[in-house]
């Protein structure tokens, strides 16, 4: 009723605000309120402000056109500023209790430490900071993908065009377009690198001078500058069909490797990507080797011996596709050390083949090592899971378990593997810090925790402790989760599957529990006065395979040890639930409260007696210590007096006698 009343009262104000002129600057509270609006409100604001624009423009129809246009531009600029600035999504209040206030992007104050003297300078600096790319962000990754394309194009086609003249001359218009498009991307990448932030003391640096200095003093900057030197001007001297003058474009290779590294960390299938990446590297090496073989054959002379490429005057070997495929075939046979190629004849041919064989051995070793390790990593999870199954099978055979039970266990393992539920979450997340583990657990179990009634008013710290203690469990068809009369030591939350509340015969069904339901939460609290006591009141059985989250009583008690207030809130919440359901014996509660008061009084008396005994012992120790100190002081005073008397006596004996007077 309060929320509805508040909504009714606030609606006129909201309607009034729609007719108010848009403000260019707002106070801090207004900015905060605007930033916390949901994004769905943007459409309403847009339509209302455009309607306002039309209403403001209507009375001006008969006035001058220039004035109407100026007013229109001003309102549009204000509308664009308010609607296109960054807005944060509305946070989940339940989630915020776990996570605390979110850290917004913190801009470091760089340079000489002096701020801008006027607001215009600050606005300009903030506008420039919008173009600083976060190297861990999505836009930077998309740019890496874009820059990797021209790099890969140059590494694959530039050398092929330099070696195969037919490829260069037949499509030189296409190559010119692609070359200069890649040059534009290279130049743009140089400016992007100047606007790419980096972390300093954990914060993203956005100062322009620092970004520029950080990039310029690296080796990569020198390579990037060398890769955009306009060597194409040499075309005027040697001709347009000499693409080898653009070999400096190959120096931009680091961006392609960076894209591959980031993709490997982002992809959900890193092993497959590593294999694909390895195959790409091998294909590029074979491609380059084929081009070099063709270039050597051209320099020696086509068909002069059996090792070089056959004479291109032969129609069978005189067209482009056959030239490239033949060279690629020769390169593949050589680098894979298969052989079966014509032996070299000249010394330079021998040297090239020896070099190829060495490269081939390295490639073969790399392939065997990398592919072997990748396959081992891909099968590591399966091998570990299979080892568990084998151990269980061996145990069941040793203990002569029945075939039906053995088949049931095997089906349970099959269900875990088929539905990807064989991962031990605690083992996987143990390498993460506690904060990240809590964040992941909250994101995974948030919707589940919201359905538990007793956790609605708990402290955020306790909820974080509890969410880390939830353990997933999988039950097979027909398994009993709990039986009537059992002592309740766990509470369960159903993630997937269906459970039935059945009679003692196990057949008659009283109720059906589905995903999102929870049970057993009251029994683990040990609430005094509960008519259920600490025992289960129903039989709950799994109809199929069911995924449940379990929270044990020991884990709950361990968590609430450090949160006594939260424990009291949990017990009060549990009493309210029991009272609503008529399961709380108020007389027993009152009696237990009286017993608690009596126990507290007895405990207080015991504590008072203990304190009195300790005080008396301390007083006796103090009195004894005081007497000892007095005795020591008396002894010291006596010794001091005796020393003073001895000193005065010795001074009298050592003093000279006065001389006798003469008569």
From Swiss-Prot:
Extracellular compartment spans: 167-176, 242-246, 297-319
Pfam families assigned: CLZ, cNMP_binding, Ion_trans
Subcellular location: Cell projection, Cilium membrane
Annotated tissue distribution: Olfactory neurons.
GO biological process, one term: sodium ion transport
Keyword set includes Translocase: no
Oligomer status and interactors: The olfactory cyclic nucleotide-gated channel is an heterotetramer composed of CNGA2, CNGA4 and CNGB1b subunits with 2:1:1 stoichiometry.
Protein known as: Cyclic nucleotide-gated channel alpha-2
Organism: Bos taurus (Bovine)
């Amino acid at each position: 009723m309060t929320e509805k009343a508040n909504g009714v009262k606030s609606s006129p104000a909201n309607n009034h605000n729609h007719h108010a002129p848009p403000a260019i600057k707002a106070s801090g509270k207004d900015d905060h309120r605007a930033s916390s609006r949901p994004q769905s409100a943007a459409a309403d604001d847009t339509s209302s402000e455009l309607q306002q624009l039309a209403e403001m423009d209507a009375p001006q129809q008969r006035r001058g056109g220039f004035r109407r246009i100026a007013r229109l531009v001003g309102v549009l600029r204000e509308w664009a500023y308010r609607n296109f600035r960054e807005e944060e999504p509305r946070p989940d209040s339940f989630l915020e209790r776990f996570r605390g206030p979110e850290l917004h992007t913190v801009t470091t104050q760089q340079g000489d430490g002096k701020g801008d003297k006027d607001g215009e300078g600050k606005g300009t600096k903030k506008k420039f900071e919008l173009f600083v790319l976060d190297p861990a962000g999505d836009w930077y990754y998309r740019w890496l993908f874009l820059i990797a394309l021209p790099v890969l194009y140059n590494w694959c086609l530039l050398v092929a065009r330099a070696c195969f003249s037919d490829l260069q001359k037949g499509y030189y218009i296409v190559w010119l377009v692609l070359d200069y498009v890649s040059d534009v991307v290279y130049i743009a990448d140089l400016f992007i690198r100047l606007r790419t932030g980096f972390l300093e003391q954990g914060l993203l640096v956005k100062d322009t001078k620092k970004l520029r200095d950080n990039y310029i003093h690296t080796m990569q900057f020198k390579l990037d500058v060398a890769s955009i030197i306009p060597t194409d001007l040499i075309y005027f001297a040697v001709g347009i069909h000499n693409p080898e003058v653009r070999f400096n474009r190959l120096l931009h290779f680091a961006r392609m490797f960076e894209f591959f590294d980031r993709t490997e960390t982002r992809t959900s299938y890193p092993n497959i990507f590593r294999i694909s990446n390895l195959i790409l590297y091998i294909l590029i090496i074979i491609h380059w080797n084929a081009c070099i073989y063709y270039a050597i054959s051209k320099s020696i002379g086509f068909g002069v011996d059996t090792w070089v490429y056959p004479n291109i005057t032969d129609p069978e070997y005189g067209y482009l596709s056959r030239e490239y495929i033949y060279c690629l075939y020769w390169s593949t046979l050589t680098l894979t050390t298969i052989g079966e190629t014509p032996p070299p004849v000249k010394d330079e041919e021998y040297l090239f083949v020896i070099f190829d064989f060495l490269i081939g051995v390295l490639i073969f070793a790399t392939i065997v090592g990398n592919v072997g390790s990748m396959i081992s990593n891909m099968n590591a999870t399966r091998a570990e899971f299979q080892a568990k199954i084998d151990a269980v099978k061996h145990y069941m055979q040793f203990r002569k378990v029945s075939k039906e039970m053995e088949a049931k266990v095997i089906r349970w393992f099959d269900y875990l593997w088929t539905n990807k539920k064989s991962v031990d979450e605690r083992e996987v997340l143990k390498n993460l810090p506690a904060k990240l583990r809590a964040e992941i657990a909250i994101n995974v179990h948030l919707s589940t925790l919201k359905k538990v009634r007793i956790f609605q008013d708990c402290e955020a710290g306790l909820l974080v402790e509890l969410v880390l203690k939830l353990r997933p469990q999988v039950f097979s068809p027909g398994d009993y989760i709990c039986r009537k009369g059992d002592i309740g030591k766990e509470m369960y939350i159903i993630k997937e599957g269906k459970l039935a509340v059945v009679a003692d015969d196990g057949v008659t069904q009283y109720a059906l529990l589905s995903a999102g339901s929870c049970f057993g939460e009251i029994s683990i609290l040990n609430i005094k006065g509960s008519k259920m006591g600490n025992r289960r009141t129903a039989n709950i059985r799994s109809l199929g395979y069911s995924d449940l989250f379990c929270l044990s009583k020991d884990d709950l008690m361990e968590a609430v040890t450090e949160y006594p207030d939260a424990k009291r809130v949990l017990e009060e919440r549990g009493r309210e639930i029991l009272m609503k359901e008529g399961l709380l014996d108020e007389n027993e509660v009152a009696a237990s409260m009286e017993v608690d008061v009596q126990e507290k009084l007895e405990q207080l008396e015991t504590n008072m007696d203990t304190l009195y005994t300790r005080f008396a012992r301390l007083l006796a120790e103090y009195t004894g210590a005081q007497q000892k100190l007095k005795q020591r002081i008396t002894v010291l005073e006596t010794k001091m007096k005796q020393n003073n008397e001895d000193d005065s006596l010795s001074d009298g004996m050592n003093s000279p006698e006065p001389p006798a007077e003469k008569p």
